[in-house]
Amino acid sequence: MERLPEVPSPLVDRFGRVHTDLRFSLTDRCNLRCTYCMPAEGLNWLPRAEVLTDDEVVRLVRIGTERLGITEVRLTGGEPLLRRGLPGLVARLSALDPAPELSITTNGIGLARSAVALREAGLSRVNVSLDTLRPERFAEITRRDRIKDVLAGLSAARDAGLNPVKINAVPVRGVNDDEIVDLAAFSAEHGYQMRFIESMPLDAQGAWDRDRMVTAAEVLDRLGERFELVPVGRQDNAPAEEWRIAGTDALVGVIASVTRPFCGTCDRVRLTADGQLRNCLFATEESDLRSLLRRGADDATVEGAWRTSVGGKGPGHAINSPEFRRPERPMSAIGG
């Protein structure tokens, strides 16, 4: 048996960025049809035979933690709660040695009935996407009348000890930008952390409009009209710049992916549900790790492909450059 080093060699790109955070999409399927993400009829989902099995997911995460220095794994989708047997998969991942910190990004539907099981399996934290508090607007944005399920999921996650519970919202001009203050106040009242994310050109329809993007600066201006904000800064390589609402413990963060890119400190790498490694959210090329696994490649070969991919990572996403090219995969097929 191959002897592994006690401390894995860091996963470093040519700019010296060390990658410790893995975003792993478990499915491209979703039970919502958000207007800024996909068409009403949905997308052509991956055939199930092309989706990584639980054994393949566990093996790739194990290679990441044992050989590459991955310390955090966020499970994403599509909607990861649609993955059958998710608590069992989480339990297997949390039993790895070394074990990564496990978190999940979800739309919250189904979280009310699974939060306790996920926490007991080893999940630490949860981010829930919620762009509005108004039931009729939620139905318009998501094309589904499920806001009660999302709110119940938030409460269940908090009560199960999946802390911090963070709410992710994408403010879009003329759609929900009038709820920025309300969302922050709601989060503070219920013990959640709020994150406002600038919209990015990752929708399946290719309809992203920069003029409808509400910038991080605008978000802070609107919050500042209601709250006194105390700067907290940015934690390590986290993308969110954080503020505390004065007189409370409530935190509000903004992720300025477009107007203040943080590519220079990026520590993330992504795996899609069909086993394609992406060294950047906006990458136009992928490395096929699934084929390596299914051809019987050993761990060292998979590790080598992983390092080669990250070694070729570019300096940034180039959204603000005339040469910017959208990735062929939409966000729902990449994983957030």
Residues covered by each model-derived region:
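Glycine-centered loop/turn positions within well-structured domains
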Residues: 32, 135-136, 261, 287
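Short, small-residue-rich loop/turn micro-motifs
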Residues: 28-30, 38-41, 130-132, 198, ...
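Residues that scaffold the ATP/ADP-binding catalytic core of kinase and kinase-like folds
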Residues: 33, 37, 83, 136, ...
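Auxiliary Fe-S-binding modules of radical SAM enzymes
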Residues: 1-22, 181, 185-189, 199-336
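Conserved N-terminal glycine/acidic-rich loop preference
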Residues: 2-19, 35-36, 70-74, 112-117, ...
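Canonical Radical SAM [4Fe-4S] cluster-binding loop centered on the CxxxCxxC motif
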Residues: 14-55
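Radical SAM/AdoMet-radical enzyme domain recognition
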Residues: 51, 57-74, 79, 83-197
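A short acidic, helix-capping loop that chelates divalent metal ions and anchors anionic groups
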Residues: 42-47, 134-141, 203-207, 288-290
